[in-house]
Each structure stands twice: as C-alpha cells, then as structure tokens.
C-alpha cells in the first residue's frame, strides 16, 4: 500500500509527499484516512511531492494526515443501477434513495474510440421545434451546441429538447449538470418523474456551489456512464443509442480555469487556462458514435457578454455538428425560442441528406430573412413607404417567417398558460414553403405568432377577423 502525508493545503489544492521511488501517476485518486475526501493527482512537483485537487471541501484537513494511493483514477458506478438516480462527481447517490446497485465501476479518464471504431450517420433526429428542424437539423449520433448569453433561454430550450426527444426516444439518457443552478437540477428531476421516463435517465450533478474539482470532473463522470451504455453489448450483440445532455460546457471550462490558476499555471488569452483546447478536446473526442452504439449529445454553452469570439465558445464550435445560436435581439422581440436562423448552422444541411424540398425551402427562408436584414437600415431611416413593392412583399414575408419560428413549449406551459406544440418536420417544411411561395400573403402577421403548424395560423387569423 502506497502512502504519503499532506504537506500543504491551499484552498482546493493539496500537496502530498510520497516516497521518491513510489510517486503516484497523474490522475490517480488518493484517499485521505478518516475522511470521505478524494484527491486527484494533477502534477508531480519532484522530490516525491504531488500536487492534487480535492473533490470536495478541504475543511478539516491538516498537515501530516495520511493519504493512500488507490493505484487508479477515480472510478464511478456504471450500468442500469444508475438509471433514475441522482449522483455526484464520485458516483455517490445524493437523492436519499439508498445505495446504488452497480454492475461495474469504470475510470472516468478513458481514451476516445480509435479512428477505425468510429461511425458516422446521416439519419436526422426530429426535435419538433420548427426553427431547429428547418434551419439547423440535428444528426442522430451528432453533437449539438446551444449557444447563448445570460437569460436568453438555453436551459428552457434544453429542457424542451429533452421533453421532445428523450420522451419519444426509447433509449437511455444521461444528464450532466455542470456548475449550474441546483434549482434547475431539481426541476429536471421532477420533469422526468412527472413524465414517467425517470427510469431511463441517469443524472450527475456538480452544481455551482461545489468546489472547482467537482465541477471540472462531473462532465467526465456523466460521459463515462453514457459510454458504458453505448459500448456494453446486449443480447443482440449491440450497444445502445444514448442521449447525453450537458448543461453547461462553459462552466466546465471555467472550473478548468480555476483549477489551472490554483495549480500556478500562467493564464493565456482572457485569463483562460493555457490547456483550454486540450481539455475541451479530451471531453469532446470521447463523445462519439461507434459501430456498436451512438451517443447523441446536446450541450448548452454560455456565451460570456454575448461574445461568440470569446475563447471558450470559440473552442467549442469546432467540435460540433450543429450549432443553435440564441439571440438577445430576437428574445427582445418576444419571439421564443430566440434562435437566430441566420447564425445557426448544421453539417446536415445538404440536399443529399435532408432532401431537395427541405434544402430549397431553407435556402429561400434564409434569403428572405437576409434581404429583410439588409433592408432594416433603409426602413429605419426612410420608412416602409420608400421601398419597392417587391421589397415590401419580402419584408412582409420575412416578418411572418420570424413570427412563425416562435412556438409554445411544453416546459413553459406553467408560465405562459399556452399548451406546448410538437410540430413534425413535414408540417414545418410545408408551412414555411407556403409562406415563401406567397400563399399566406393575405393573412396578418400576428396570426403567425406562437402557434404550431400552418393550419393553426389560418384558424387564428379567422378568429382575429371574426
């Protein structure tokens, strides 16, 4: 048994001295005698001293306490026993529902699947949210980022996606709450419980009030549980299709920044850790699909000060298949979900994947919206009357499209009083195609606001004129 003693404690950082010929490896977990605290080795400083980060509060620790090297990285329970349970970063239950019965324990630091093991798919994942399905469709087994500043609706959009996809999806889901509000974690738990899909969801939380070590590692804990479901073959010899929700990737980066500063590394641009790209890559490269099973991940990404060029969101962009950008200016118009249709993108936007009709409709919608955007300055200075008849028509259609992008959410029913709407992709394409074709030029634009499919628009317009 390899034992050392604590020689220094600075906040969440603990230095431990071991015999020089028996120094623990980086990422090894150390247990401190008489406590439940786990330390993770981050650096080897020489002379047998290792610098570690504490996963938990360091209150009550003192020098000369004995720390034992476990000989491996942090392990967490995996398997069906984790479903319906809320766990912390170490896989300990925090829902007061008794111990977790697990089939196996896996280390949270793992290699990404090799290049030949990876598989790609072109199958679309329908979300029932019009603006997403039309402008930035998701791929099954792909990675999606929800980008947005403070208070534009990332978590509400995430909850609606969980509501629409996880409930319809017969597979399993893992939710990793990384540095977010405890209230949101609680809301999510009750949302799943009320909709009877709790037994298909594993929840891992490292919330805002926890030390940086917990927030940094909780995303890896959730990912490890998802990887087990993907890789573990069932009776048919196949793994499962798993949904992985991470809220919020920015807090993962921020926890890394805190740890990096505590470890004494020189900060890089905007104060971020110099290892930002590598840390992001280590997490994102593991979120992938293999021939065995798939992981479809939906990640919320906070954008500091609404600046998409900030190093944290900018580093995340390169790893994603679809990006959904939420805009404060669209939220200010009262259009929810506040997705910016011209700033959101998807690698699936190819006529060979989504079909000619969908592709052409999307292109025409984008052209109409772009034309309206270009004309906004002229309208602001000279007014609508100075526009040509063609331009007036384009502006009218663009405003209808903008309003038709809004829709009532199931998860927002309690606030709005309007029942949520799930719109199938074929109805979405049909509706927007009809608008750009000019079939509804005679209807008032208010009729397009906060409805589901195009039939509801006609019904609403009839009520308004009645």
UniProtKB/Swiss-Prot annotation:
The record's annotation in CDD domains points to: ATP-synt_F1_beta_C, ATP-synt_F1_beta_N, F1-ATPase_beta_CD
Q: Name one Pfam family in it.
A: ATP-synt_ab
Which residues make up the binding site for ATP?
148-155
Q: List the SMART domains hit by this protein, alphabetically.
A: AAA
E.C. number(s) listed in UniProt: 7.1.2.2
The protein's annotated catalytic reaction(s) are:
ATP + H2O + 4 H(+)(in) = ADP + phosphate + 5 H(+)(out)
Give the membrane topology, semicolon-separated if more than one.
Peripheral membrane protein
Q: Where is the protein found, in the record's own terms?
A: Cell inner membrane
Looking up Gene3D superfamilies in the UniProt record yields:
2.40.10.170, Bovine Mitochondrial F1-atpase, Atp Synthase Beta Chain, Chain D, domain 3, P-loop containing nucleotide triphosphate hydrolases
Identify the GO cellular component terms for this protein: plasma membrane; proton-transporting ATP synthase complex
Query: What are the alphabetically sorted keywords of the record?
Result: ATP synthesis, ATP-binding, Cell inner membrane, Cell membrane, CF(1), Hydrogen ion transport, Ion transport, Membrane, Nucleotide-binding, Translocase, Transport
Similarity annotation:
Belongs to the ATPase alpha/beta chains family.
Q: PANTHER family under this entry?
A: ATP SYNTHASE (PTHR15184), ATP SYNTHASE SUBUNIT BETA, MITOCHONDRIAL (PTHR15184:SF71)
User: What quaternary structure, including any partners, is listed in this protein's UniProt entry?
Assistant: F-type ATPases have 2 components, CF(1) - the catalytic core - and CF(0) - the membrane proton channel. CF(1) has five subunits: alpha(3), beta(3), gamma(1), delta(1), epsilon(1). CF(0) has three main subunits: a(1), b(2) and c(9-12). The alpha and beta chains form an alternating ring which encloses part of the gamma chain. CF(1) is attached to CF(0) by a central stalk formed by the gamma and epsilon chains, while a peripheral stalk is formed by the delta and b chains.
Q: What does this protein do?
A: Produces ATP from ADP in the presence of a proton gradient across the membrane. The catalytic sites are hosted primarily by the beta subunits.
The name under which this protein is listed is: ATP synthase subunit beta
Natural source organism: Xylella fastidiosa (strain Temecula1 / ATCC 700964)
Q: Which gene encodes it?
A: atpD
